């Protein structure tokens, strides 16, 4: 009997019919707290890694080796006043940050941490993740519009165009994964990557989707960077052009919610990429299968997040027209071509996903 089965049986005996509701709330709370801690220390890791790339130390004053720096940053933002511009639309101005951060949390309902460990193991998990993650753009648009500032509105318009453009290529990448796995269930997609010619020899990592679907993996990950408005696609909040984009008139915790959503979305994109293309909780080699699946998922997500940060420290910011051209004239045609190629591949005698 697994740990979850033991907890379920004990809780049912203790609380009866109320236990499923209590257990669901406990799991949601645990996942939310862990995500918040991950965001706090992802920001510290970003500052440290970029510091090392710049040949400097990074934050090292608050706590041992700077480990308490995220807590100091949170306290600073909590103590700052939320100053609302006189010309802003009050309620829309206050609702916008919530509309950005809630979808970022909601996506975690369907992401499997290991076999059987998922908040909601629904059959349409992939569709749910794509739909929910698309809602955040409305909060960005409302933030730019409610501030009644030309800089904020320009940033919001850029965000809307950029997110819609790259959602198309991300959607094509997810369709290709759906074609190969034959299911929208994220746990089922991970399970479909655990068998194959290479997996039978213990080389599990060669059976994952990243190898046969490499162009889709690259397109999905780069589109994910653009979706989260991260460097080098951060023209939405381009400091040298429009100050801070849609967040220019926000302060205190309202401002912090936008940053919280950005970093949660980074983790979401990395977790989905690991699940869809890198085998999720699967071990890279058969002899390492004794290691808990969540350890492998965390390791893969950490690696992909480090690539996010490396891109920020390495590449210059694209011009807005270059970003649009990349999405519409390069990524979408590549996705359509590879979609057709994979379709013929699946129908041919050389199908490796049987």
Swiss-Prot record:
Keyword DNA damage present in the record's keywords: the answer is no
InterPro entries in alphabetical order: NADH_UbQ_OxRdtase_su1/FPO (IPR001694), NADH_UbQ_OxRdtase_su1_CS (IPR018086)
- Membrane spanning segments where? 25-45, 91-111, 126-146, 170-190, 205-225, 267-287, 290-310, 330-350
Q: Name the major location.
A: membrane
* GO cellular component terms listed in the entry, alphabetical order: plasma membrane
Reactions catalysed, semicolon-separated, are: a quinone + NADH + 5 H(+)(in) = a quinol + NAD(+) + 4 H(+)(out)
Recorded E.C. number(s)? 7.1.1.-
Name of the featured protein: NADH-quinone oxidoreductase subunit H
Look up and give the organism this protein is from. Paraburkholderia phytofirmans (strain DSM 17436 / LMG 22146 / PsJN)
């Amino acid at each position: 009997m697994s740990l979850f089965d033991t907890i379920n049986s004990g809780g049912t005996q203790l609380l009866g019919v109320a236990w499923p509701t209590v257990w669901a709330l406990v799991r949601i709370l645990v996942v939310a707290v862990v995500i918040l801690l991950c965001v706090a220390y992802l920001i510290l890791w970003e500052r440290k890694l970029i510091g090392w790339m710049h040949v400097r130390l990074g934050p090292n004053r608050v706590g041992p080796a700077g480990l308490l720096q995220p807590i100091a940053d949170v306290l600073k933002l909590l103590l700052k006043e939320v100053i609302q511009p006189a010309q802003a639309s009050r309620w829309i101005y206050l609702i916008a940050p919530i509309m950005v951060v809630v979808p970022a949390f909601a996506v975690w309902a369907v992401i499997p941490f290991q076999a059987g460990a998922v908040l909601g193991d629904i059959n349409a998990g992939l569709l749910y993740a794509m739909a929910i993650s698309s809602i955040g753009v409305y909060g960005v648009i409302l933030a730019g519009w409610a501030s009644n500032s030309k800089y904020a509105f320009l940033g919001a318009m850029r965000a809307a165009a950029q997110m819609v453009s790259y959602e198309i290529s991300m959607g094509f990448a997810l369709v290709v994964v759906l074609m190969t796995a034959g299911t929208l269930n994220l746990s089922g997609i991970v399970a479909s990557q655990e068998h194959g010619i290479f997996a039978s020899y213990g080389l599990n990592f060669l059976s994952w989707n990243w190898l046969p679907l490499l162009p889709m993996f690259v397109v999905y990950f780069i589109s994910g960077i653009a979706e989260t408005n991260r460097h080098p696609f951060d023209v939405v909040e381009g400091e040298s052009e429009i100050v801070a984009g849609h967040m220019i008139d926000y302060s205190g915790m309202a401002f912090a919610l936008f940053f919280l959503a950005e970093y949660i979305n980074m983790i979401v994109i990395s977790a989905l990429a690991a699940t869809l293309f890198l085998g999720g909780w699967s071990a890279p080699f058969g002899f390492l299968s004794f290691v808990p699946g969540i350890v492998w998922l965390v390791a893969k997500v950490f690696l992909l997040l480090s690539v996010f940060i490396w891109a920020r420290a390495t590449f210059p910011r694209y011009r807005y027209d270059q970003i649009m051209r990349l999405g519409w004239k390069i990524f979408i045609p590549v996705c359509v071509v590879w979609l057709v190629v994979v379709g013929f591949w699946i129908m041919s005698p050389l199908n490796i996903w049987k």
